[in-house]
Design a protein with these regions (language model features):
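Residues immediately flanking
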Residues: 159, 263, 318, 442, ...
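Carbohydrate-interacting/catalytic domains
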Residues: 1-87, 96, 148, 274-277, ...
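Conserved beta-strand->loop/alpha-helix structural units within folded catalytic cores of enzymes
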Residues: 78-92, 141-159, 222
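Glycine-rich, phosphate-binding/catalytic loops in enzymes
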Residues: 98, 106-108, 172-173, 247-249, ...
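Aromatic-lined carbohydrate-binding surfaces of glycoside hydrolases
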Residues: 93-105, 159-176
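Alpha-amylase-like alpha-glycosidases and glucanotransferases acting on alpha-linked glucans and related
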Residues: 118-146, 150-153, 163-391, 395, ...
Length: 515
């Protein structure tokens, strides 16, 4: 019997051996495994593809008033931008700008001295692989990328596959463009708008292989200069097959590259681009302003299958988009949209100086174009203005960094408020260790109040015991009890509240000395 006992103990020890358990986990029994009917590709991307904060500026507007800013001027702003909590610095095209049909202030016909639109790429200085000499040299740009990295910032470049009439491609490869009956190259049109300063590529040219290879070489060139993040201009106007091929080629050698699709188009097209490999996508967020609109839109984005392939990047404004809400809502509208973008989405961005300073002047009645837009002229921004939003932006980004719940697009739930001017939602980690409630007054003019109802049990909070709600924007702490609690938000003070819940307040029963 003693021998049998020793043998049994040895078998037990062997069965419980940690090393054996590790081997069994690594090499599981596959005798019952079946093959999926379709072969699926799994793509692994950097964390920044999921969680990022973007800041956009025009380098030429970073100099002294009346002078063209340079990469060196941008470099001097890096501590400030990084200090606000951003980790991506997005620059519009930095290439030479064409002179033919150059645009002037407010999209008028250009005059001598106008800097033109950065999206009219190409001149006698060069094309997509060249740097506008007014900004500096290629070495200056490389230095900017290096110094930005030291501040925790990735420099994102704009990829705009289009040319000015002066681009070297128009002379060297006229076959890459569409032509009019008179033989001239066809400029871009989006009726009733005409863009005489821009020639789009003809992706259906008989020389498409050479064209595609050259466009790929542009992306690779800038990767070689240290760029790992790209914002792609109007990808929905190019063939799907082109993007599937180009992204595949780029990712094969550089899987760390992140591509943001700037495609304001039909949802099916936006979703198709995401499935083809774009890391992030612009959204309709800018035009969803009421609580019901926001609820409906983000319920769509947060549910499978869309959430499995579409990563939203939320922008309350861009150089092209100054919404009516921002035009008429005053400073409180900018604050509300900032909080919404930064807490509804794991990735968001702002067109920086204009947003910080609450720039709300439209070019025309009913237009979303900025008056005196930076797209066509230099702007001198008073970055030190006392009414700027820098302090709030810094605080919101700090809250995002400290709370894992805000670093993913999963875990979003909306909650009733009994007031359709209040939007209430929680973001939580899968284990509910981090739960944040955000309540936003979407009415930028009037104080709103209501009762917010929460499913406390889902968050590990006993409904019969008080718990602490720490409001992170003001620092205030409230003692809440039960699932329904009162909130009141004055938009002129702060149009939003972000609560972090602390576990139930302890009572005498919770201490050892209670007998």
């Amino acid at each position: 019997h003693a021998g049998s006992l020793r043998k049994a103990r040895g078998a037990t020890a062997a069965a419980l051996d940690a090393g054996l358990g590790e081997l069994m986990g690594r090499y599981a029994d596959r005798s019952g495994a079946v093959r999926h009917p379709r072969e699926l590709a799994v793509e692994v991307e950097p964390v920044k593809a999921r969680f990022s904060a973007w800041y956009e500026l025009f380098p030429r507007s970073t100099g002294e008033p009346g002078t063209n800013g340079t990469f060196s001027d941008v470099e001097s702003l890096l501590p400030e931008i990084s200090g606000m909590g951003f980790d991506v610095l997005y620059l519009p095209p930095i290439h030479p700008i064409g002179r033919t049909q150059r645009k002037g202030a407010n999209n008028r016909k250009g005059t001598p001295g106008d800097p033109g639109s950065p999206w009219a790429i190409g001149s006698e200085q060069g094309g997509h692989k060249s740097v506008n000499q007014d900004l500096g040299t290629l070495d200056d740009f490389r230095r900017l990328v290096r110094v930005a990295a030291e501040h925790g910032l990735d420099v994102a470049l704009d990829i705009a596959f289009q040319c000015s009439p002066d681009h070297p491609y128009t002379r060297e490869h006229p076959e890459w463009f569409r032509h009019r009956p008179d033989g001239s190259i066809q400029y871009a049109e989006n009726p009733p708008k005409k863009y005489e300063d821009i020639f789009p590529f003809n992706f259906e040219t008989e020389q498409w292989r050479e064209l595609w290879a050259e466009l790929l070489s542009i992306v690779v060139f800038w990767i070689e200069q240290g760029v790992r993040v790209f914002r792609v201009d109007n990808p929905h106007t190019k063939p799907f097959a082109f993007w599937e091929w180009l992204i595949g080629e780029v990712k094969r050698e550089h899987p760390e590259v992140i591509l943001l699709a700037e495609a304001f188009t039909r949802p099916k097209v936006m979703f198709r681009l995401a499935k083809l490999g774009f890391s992030q996508s612009y959204t309709y967020f800018a035009w969803r302003n009421t609580a019901p609109e926001l609820y409906q839109y983000f319920m769509e984005l947060a549910q499978p299958p869309i959430r499995e392939f579409f990563r939203p990047n939320l922008w309350p404004n861009t150089p092209d988009i100054l919404t009516e809400y921002l035009q008429t809502g005053g400073r409180s509208a900018f604050m509300a949209r900032l909080v919404l973008a930064a807490t509804l989405g794991a990735s968001y961005g702002i067109y920086g100086p204009a947003f910080e300073l609450c720039e709300s002047r439209a070019r025309d009645q009913g237009s979303e174009e900025y008056l005196d837009s930076e797209k066509y002229q230099l702007r001198a921004w008073d970055r030190g203005h006392p009414d700027n939003l820098r302090e709030l932006i810094t605080l919101v980004n700090e809250i995002r960094r400290e709370n894992p719940a805000l670093q993913t697009d999963r875990g979003l739930r909306f909650h009733p408020t009994e007031n359709d001017r209040l939007l209430a939602y929680t973001k939580s980690t899968s284990d509910h260790a981090d739960v944040l409630l955000t309540v936003v007054n979407v009415d930028p003019h009037h104080t709103q109040n209501g009762m917010v109802t929460l499913p406390l049990g889902d968050f590990g909070i006993e409904s019969g015991r008080p718990y602490q709600a720490h409001e992170l924007l003001s620092g205030a702490r409230y003692l809440w009890n039960g699932p329904r609690n009162y909130v009141e938000i004055n938009p002129h003070a702060m149009p939003a509240q972000i609560f972090r819940f602390r576990r139930p307040v302890r009572r005498e029963h919770d201490f050892e000395y209670f007998l």
